[in-house]
Regions:
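Eukaryotic scaffold repeat domains enriched in small/polar residues
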Residues: 1-300
Length: 300
């Protein structure tokens, strides 16, 4: 992943080496840092950016808990200030449900967590001014948390439930292959030494139905995707809705009061990836799983 930083610099995420590094406009590498901090036994912070604000401060998610501890149902949005590297908790959000597998002895323990596909979770994003926007999965409403801590909550949005059948399961598996399958994290203890590794996980486009049935599935899809909420230049938050398998992509758009002001439809297998001064950048896939980047005029 690549993130824009002030001064025409970018932030590169290197999962293979478990580090992040900045790259300047002169193509010289800058400071590096680990993707995980803390002790897995008491609480691990995975410092993989989900957003960067206009000051270049990085926002990551903390899942809390630790080896041998019950996993909490909420995570924290952490702001890492560039320069000082100070960390502040700026919001809390609901985590997706997981299955946990543990093996080994006290000094040789292996803990693996797998997210339950399509389980409800909150989504969040960050505006350029550092405001946090969250979509709450309980009743599907959007709230904004300003840099001073004040909160504005919008009205709940009513949507029709989408049942999960075999087509929805197949589409989920295919989407994991399209986007790299998300990030898998493995923590291991070998003779008292702790190691953390990262990789791309998830199902594949050719997963058999029998493989899909091995997962734990909810009865219905949640109202929206738990992926990053993107804020456009008009300070509107774009939340991607869940739909029936094979249907066009839908985005609900919310203003700074948390009220839905528009719903936009994109072609099937398309998703918003970024915004420019007056355009929307959309990634799409064709029948051969080739990626294309499109620029649309910004809807008003």
């Amino acid at each position: 992943a690549v993130w824009a930083l002030p001064g025409d610099s970018i932030l590169l995420i290197d999962l293979g080496n478990g580090r992040m590094v900045s790259l300047g406009p002169d193509l010289e590498f800058g400071p590096t840092g680990p993707l995980s901090t803390g002790d897995p036994r008491s609480g691990l912070t995975i410092a993989i950016p989900q957003a960067v604000d206009g000051n270049g401060d990085v926002y990551v998610r903390s899942m809390g808990g630790g080896m041998g501890a019950a996993r909490p149902d909420s995570g924290a949005v952490l702001r890492v200030t560039r320069g000082t590297l100070s960390v502040d908790t700026v919001a809390m959000f609901k985590l997706p449900e997981v299955t946990v597998t543990e093996s080994g002895s006290a000094n040789d323990r292996n803990v693996s967590m797998s997210v339950i596909p399509l389980s409800p979770q909150d989504a969040w994003g960050v505006a350029p001014d550092g405001s946090i926007v969250l979509a709450r999965s309980g009743d599907y409403h959007v709230e904004w948390i300003a840099p001073d801590g004040s909160i504005v909550s919008g009205s709940p949005v009513r949507v029709e439930s989408v049942s999960i059948g075999i087509d929805e399961k197949r589409e989920w598996a295919r989407s994991q292959a399209e986007t790299g399958g998300g990030i898998s994290i493995q923590v291991m203890m070998d003779n008292g030494a702790l190691t953390t590794s990262f990789g791309r996980g998830g199902g594949g486009a050719n997963a058999e139905d029998e493989e899909l049935d091995q997962y734990t599935w909810p009865d219905v899809k949640p109202p929206f995707y738990g992926t990053r909420i993107i804020v456009d230049p008009q300070d509107r938050a774009w939340v991607r809705r869940h739909v029936d398998a094979g249907q066009p992509t839908l985005y609900d758009v919310f203003d700074r009061q948390g009220e839905r002001v528009a719903t936009y439809e994109l072609p099937f297998r398309s998703r918003v990836v970024s915004f420019g001064a007056s355009g929307v950048y959309v990634a799409s896939l064709d029948d051969f799983d080739l990626n294309y980047l499109h620029r649309y005029t910004m809807p008003m």
